[in-house]
Amino acid sequence: MALKPRCSLVLVVACCAPEAAWSIEPQAINVYGFDFTPTFALSESYDDNFREVEHDVESTMVTRLAPAFELKAEDRNSATRVIWEPTRYIYHSASDASNTAQRLRADSIMEFTDRHRLKLEAEARKYERTTSTAVDGINDKIESKRVGGVYTFGARSALNQIDLGASYAELRYDNADGINDDKERNTSNLTTTWYHRLGSKTRGLLEYDHTRFDYLQSNSPRSSRSDAVLAGAEWDMTAKTTGKLRVGYERKNFDQSGSDDLSNPTWQVDLAWKPRTYSTFTFLARQAMAEGDDGSDAVKATFTQVGWRHGWTERITSVAEVGMGHYVYEGQDRSDDLQDYKLGVIYEMRRWLDVELAYRHRDNDSDADNESFTRNVFQITFDVSL
């Protein structure tokens, strides 16, 4: 199973922000039968440690320009969507860190009959990372590609249902002089999940996950295969409570005898509770093995987050998140404890315009030299649609 070492909150925030009346409602344009939806986000932030380092800390103002373009087509039994997101980051006090990111994604859902469904996805990204870089002061320049699909057999209301999934991903770096060459890899994954209905709103599940990591560097100590078995349940018992729980065990076997094989309990928990239509509490917990970083063979990563999103009025919403992570770097004498806090207020100025004020604090306490840091980000964001 794959889990990013620092558990990026980009995905976590999405879990804590379900569709609601206080979000902007983009309007689509009909283009030859397709729904075309453009949006634009502009943010300005002050970041007092944008490289997340312990010494020689750099601060800067950061401007983010993020247009997005969605093209969607759907009929009775299928839907297809293509999204292009070019994003420009301008670091005003560190021009070498400024960069332009690109993301292109396509999704398709096809329902052949009530018992046969297929989901397909493909994504290509090109972006730069300013934190946890291989060389101090130089961005990691990353290119990634991924294709995947899930075939589902079984009607939605059936007693049993089976998902068969497969994916393939490539990770490459554009840094010069061989920087990050040791991290380039191809990843293939096969997943099988069996669902058994326990009630009208509850299903038990049993999942097997196999992942192969092939590093391009000859005789890489990180090339491996990972196998995980999980059991759990998912439920949508009322309009107020939804959740998914998976608990299991994971084993990672390395190709090279010089690296010790690893095993670890693993779990994924996603809970949402809505005591009111305008208020949502979320709980997220993860434990899994991530790929090695900073010279380690692998990272045993544990992360927990609690979130609260509340609409005080029809136009004003607050978002609060608290996250705690523990990371053990296998093959090194290092472990990190990360605390991550976010507080934001969103004002729906118009149907097509949201304004958000946010503050984020990250504190990493590491027992390795030069790996601890604190970081504060103050940000204002304008989200615009048609």
For the regions a protein language model found, what residue spans apply to each?
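Bacterial N-terminal signal peptides that target proteins for export
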Residues: 1-9
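Cleavable N-terminal signal peptides
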Residues: 10-11, 21
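Gram-negative and organellar
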Residues: 22-386
